[in-house]
A protein has these predicted regions:
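Acidic-aromatic/histidine active-site loop/patch
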Residues: 15, 25
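Outer-membrane beta-barrel pore domains
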Residues: 27-167
Length: 167
Protein backbone atom coordinates (compact mmCIF):
# COMPACT_ATOMS: atom_id res chain seq x y z
CA UNK A 1 0.00 0.00 0.00
CA UNK A 2 1.16 3.54 -0.65
CA UNK A 3 -0.16 7.03 -0.02
CA UNK A 4 1.32 9.64 -2.34
CA UNK A 5 0.72 13.00 -3.99
CA UNK A 6 -1.32 15.76 -2.37
CA UNK A 7 -0.02 18.85 -0.61
CA UNK A 8 0.64 20.18 2.88
CA UNK A 9 1.25 23.64 4.27
CA UNK A 10 4.74 22.66 5.44
CA UNK A 11 5.99 20.88 2.30
CA UNK A 12 3.84 22.19 -0.55
CA UNK A 13 2.88 19.86 -3.40
CA UNK A 14 4.27 16.34 -3.55
CA UNK A 15 5.26 14.64 -6.83
CA UNK A 16 2.16 13.33 -8.63
CA UNK A 17 2.98 12.59 -12.27
CA UNK A 18 2.59 9.24 -14.03
CA UNK A 19 6.38 8.85 -13.86
CA UNK A 20 6.15 9.38 -10.08
CA UNK A 21 3.40 6.74 -9.91
CA UNK A 22 5.73 4.24 -11.61
CA UNK A 23 8.46 5.05 -9.06
CA UNK A 24 5.95 4.49 -6.25
CA UNK A 25 4.74 1.24 -7.81
CA UNK A 26 8.25 -0.27 -7.80
CA UNK A 27 9.35 1.52 -4.57
CA UNK A 28 12.19 3.29 -6.37
CA UNK A 29 14.28 5.74 -4.39
CA UNK A 30 13.35 9.39 -4.47
CA UNK A 31 15.90 12.20 -4.55
CA UNK A 32 18.97 11.93 -2.31
CA UNK A 33 18.95 14.81 0.15
CA UNK A 34 22.18 16.41 1.34
CA UNK A 35 23.37 14.91 4.61
CA UNK A 36 21.11 11.85 4.33
CA UNK A 37 22.71 8.36 4.16
CA UNK A 38 20.14 7.11 1.62
CA UNK A 39 17.31 8.34 -0.55
CA UNK A 40 13.73 7.96 0.64
CA UNK A 41 11.13 6.47 -1.67
CA UNK A 42 8.31 8.72 -2.81
CA UNK A 43 5.11 8.38 -0.78
CA UNK A 44 4.25 6.59 2.44
CA UNK A 45 4.56 2.82 1.97
CA UNK A 46 3.38 -0.17 4.00
CA UNK A 47 3.92 -3.79 3.14
CA UNK A 48 3.98 -7.25 4.68
CA UNK A 49 5.62 -10.60 4.02
CA UNK A 50 3.27 -13.34 5.22
CA UNK A 51 4.80 -16.78 5.85
CA UNK A 52 2.97 -19.77 7.27
CA UNK A 53 3.06 -23.53 7.60
CA UNK A 54 -0.18 -25.48 7.99
CA UNK A 55 -0.49 -29.18 8.74
CA UNK A 56 -3.68 -31.20 9.08
CA UNK A 57 -3.80 -34.68 10.60
CA UNK A 58 -7.23 -36.29 10.88
CA UNK A 59 -9.50 -33.66 12.46
CA UNK A 60 -6.64 -31.65 13.98
CA UNK A 61 -4.87 -28.73 12.36
CA UNK A 62 -1.85 -26.64 13.30
CA UNK A 63 -0.78 -23.37 11.71
CA UNK A 64 2.48 -21.56 12.47
CA UNK A 65 3.00 -18.12 10.94
CA UNK A 66 5.18 -15.04 10.81
CA UNK A 67 4.07 -11.69 9.39
CA UNK A 68 7.01 -9.38 8.67
CA UNK A 69 5.93 -5.79 8.13
CA UNK A 70 7.94 -3.06 6.47
CA UNK A 71 7.67 0.58 5.44
CA UNK A 72 10.83 1.04 3.39
CA UNK A 73 13.52 -0.83 1.49
CA UNK A 74 15.49 -1.63 4.64
CA UNK A 75 12.48 -3.41 6.16
CA UNK A 76 11.74 -5.09 2.83
CA UNK A 77 15.24 -6.58 3.10
CA UNK A 78 14.60 -7.72 6.72
CA UNK A 79 16.87 -5.08 8.32
CA UNK A 80 14.23 -4.74 11.06
CA UNK A 81 15.06 -8.33 12.00
CA UNK A 82 12.70 -9.79 14.57
CA UNK A 83 9.92 -7.21 14.26
CA UNK A 84 6.64 -8.75 13.23
CA UNK A 85 3.79 -10.95 14.35
CA UNK A 86 4.57 -14.55 15.30
CA UNK A 87 1.63 -16.91 15.72
CA UNK A 88 0.44 -20.42 16.47
CA UNK A 89 -3.11 -21.70 15.85
CA UNK A 90 -4.33 -25.07 17.09
CA UNK A 91 -7.66 -26.34 15.80
CA UNK A 92 -9.47 -29.29 17.34
CA UNK A 93 -6.69 -30.27 19.77
CA UNK A 94 -9.51 -29.81 22.27
CA UNK A 95 -12.79 -30.93 20.63
CA UNK A 96 -14.42 -28.21 18.49
CA UNK A 97 -12.00 -25.57 19.79
CA UNK A 98 -9.50 -23.23 18.18
CA UNK A 99 -6.63 -21.89 20.33
CA UNK A 100 -4.48 -18.94 19.27
CA UNK A 101 -1.13 -17.69 20.61
CA UNK A 102 0.49 -14.57 19.12
CA UNK A 103 3.59 -12.51 19.88
CA UNK A 104 3.99 -9.03 18.38
CA UNK A 105 7.41 -7.37 18.47
CA UNK A 106 8.20 -3.85 17.19
CA UNK A 107 11.28 -3.11 19.32
CA UNK A 108 13.95 -3.33 16.60
CA UNK A 109 12.38 -0.80 14.20
CA UNK A 110 15.41 -1.10 11.93
CA UNK A 111 17.88 0.35 14.43
CA UNK A 112 20.76 -0.54 12.15
CA UNK A 113 23.14 2.21 10.97
CA UNK A 114 23.07 4.12 8.67
CA UNK A 115 19.26 3.97 8.79
CA UNK A 116 17.03 5.81 11.23
CA UNK A 117 14.26 4.07 13.16
CA UNK A 118 11.09 3.24 11.26
CA UNK A 119 8.52 4.32 13.88
CA UNK A 120 5.81 2.18 12.31
CA UNK A 121 2.80 3.95 10.80
CA UNK A 122 4.56 7.35 10.99
CA UNK A 123 5.73 9.50 8.07
CA UNK A 124 7.18 13.00 8.22
CA UNK A 125 5.46 14.18 5.00
CA UNK A 126 2.11 12.61 5.87
CA UNK A 127 1.84 13.26 9.63
CA UNK A 128 -1.64 11.72 9.93
CA UNK A 129 -0.13 8.58 8.38
CA UNK A 130 -2.15 5.39 8.64
CA UNK A 131 -4.62 6.69 11.19
CA UNK A 132 -8.22 7.72 11.60
CA UNK A 133 -9.19 10.32 14.20
CA UNK A 134 -5.80 9.86 15.83
CA UNK A 135 -5.93 6.05 16.10
CA UNK A 136 -3.69 3.71 14.12
CA UNK A 137 -5.47 1.72 11.42
CA UNK A 138 -4.79 -2.01 11.37
CA UNK A 139 -3.00 -2.64 14.64
CA UNK A 140 -4.32 -1.51 18.03
CA UNK A 141 -0.99 -2.24 19.74
CA UNK A 142 1.03 0.32 17.74
CA UNK A 143 0.45 3.89 18.83
CA UNK A 144 -0.05 6.74 16.39
CA UNK A 145 2.03 9.93 16.42
CA UNK A 146 -0.64 11.63 18.54
CA UNK A 147 0.40 9.62 21.58
CA UNK A 148 4.08 8.88 21.09
CA UNK A 149 7.00 9.71 18.79
CA UNK A 150 8.17 6.12 19.11
CA UNK A 151 6.13 2.97 19.27
CA UNK A 152 8.19 -0.06 20.29
CA UNK A 153 5.94 -2.79 21.67
CA UNK A 154 6.07 -6.38 22.82
CA UNK A 155 2.63 -7.96 23.11
CA UNK A 156 1.42 -11.47 23.92
CA UNK A 157 -2.06 -12.31 22.68
CA UNK A 158 -4.09 -15.40 23.51
CA UNK A 159 -7.49 -16.42 22.20
CA UNK A 160 -9.81 -19.39 22.39
CA UNK A 161 -12.92 -20.09 20.34
CA UNK A 162 -15.36 -22.94 20.73
CA UNK A 163 -17.37 -24.19 17.76
CA UNK A 164 -20.88 -25.44 18.39
CA UNK A 165 -21.39 -28.98 17.14
CA UNK A 166 -24.46 -28.98 14.85
CA UNK A 167 -24.95 -32.76 14.63
Amino acid sequence: NAVWGGATEDYGYFPNTFKDFLKIFISADGPLLEGEPHANALGNHLGIWDFYYKKKVDSREIKIYYQHFFEDTSGLRFANKSDGLWGLELYNYINNTKILFEYLNTTNQNRNPPYVQDYYYHHYQYPAGWSYKGYTIGNPFISSGNYSNTNPSQVLHFGIQNYKNNK
